[in-house]
């Protein structure tokens, strides 16, 4: 009984500590100024108009269905709703934590909705997998606030796990392939700069 009470108090304190009464500069905040919900669904949009639309999937190469993560060429498209999840038990994404990103409505041939990074002719690229993945292969992203922006704009870091540490020293950017697909790839230059727009619940149904 005591252990149950202690656990309940611990969870309550964790929830209260992440209530959105105020935000700090390093909090992960959406386009409307609200803290980003852990497990919530959002559109990842360019903060500068005319740089393309939101993030979606495309079928490339010999893929049986759209497994390549790309930016929509349609500037008025929000793309697909994306779930943002942390490994921590909290209502909101903890500051500076690694996150998993996954499509709320993934394609049928994907074994998992979560993004991962795989080798490709264009270099390491963001894809969906046809196989189940371990946690270390999906908790590989981190949002970094753009310091020169006075609004909530973020770069997306790619993080690699080794035996003792996690290294986050590369970014996610865009590579346009010969078919015009704006693929998300790992890069050290010209990272994506994104704003997070909360998706409506009826649009972002979970599979």
Swiss-Prot record:
The UniProt entry, under PROSITE patterns, shows: SOYBEAN_KUNITZ
Q: Which GO terms describe its molecular function?
A: serine-type endopeptidase inhibitor activity
Query: Signal peptide position in this chain?
Result: 1-24
- Cross-referenced Gene3D superfamilies: 2.80.10.50
Domain of life the protein comes from: Eukaryota
Q: Which cysteines are joined by disulfide bonds?
A: 65-109, 159-168
Does Thylakoid show up as a keyword for this record? no
Task: Kindly indicate whether the keyword RNA-binding belongs to this entry.
Answer: no
Arranged from A to Z, the UniProt key words for this protein are: Disulfide bond, Protease inhibitor, Serine protease inhibitor, Signal
Q: What is the recorded function of this protein according to its Swiss-Prot or TrEMBL entry?
A: Inhibits alpha-chymotrypsin at the molar ratio of 1:2 in state of 1:1.
| Protein family per UniProt | Belongs to the protease inhibitor I3 (leguminous Kunitz-type inhibitor) family.
- Identify this protein by name: Chymotrypsin inhibitor 3
Q: Which organism is it from?
A: Psophocarpus tetragonolobus
């Amino acid at each position: 009984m005591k252990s149950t009470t202690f656990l309940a108090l611990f969870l309550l304190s964790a929830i209260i500590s992440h209530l959105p009464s105020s935000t700090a500069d390093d909090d992960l905040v959406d386009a409307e100024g609200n803290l980003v919900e852990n497990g919530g669904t959002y559109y990842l949009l360019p903060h500068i108009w005319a740089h393309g639309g939101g993030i979606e999937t495309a079928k490339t190469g010999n893929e049986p269905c759209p497994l390549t993560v790309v930016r929509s060429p349609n500037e008025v498209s929000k793309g697909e709703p994306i779930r943002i999840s942390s490994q921590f038990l909290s209502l909101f994404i903890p500051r500076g934590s690694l996150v998993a990103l996954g499509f709320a409505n993934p394609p049928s041939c994907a074994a998992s909705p979560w993004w991962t990074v795989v080798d490709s002719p264009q270099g390491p690229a963001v894809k969906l997998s046809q196989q189940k993945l371990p946690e270390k292969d999906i908790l590989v992203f981190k949002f970094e606030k753009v310091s020169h922006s006075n609004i909530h704009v973020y770069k997306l870091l790619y993080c690699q796990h080794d035996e003792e540490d996690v290294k986050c020293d590369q970014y996610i950017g865009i590579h346009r392939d010969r078919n015009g697909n704006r693929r998300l790839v790992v890069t050290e230059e010209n990272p994506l700069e994104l704003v997070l727009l909360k998706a409506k619940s009826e649009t972002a149904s979970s599979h």
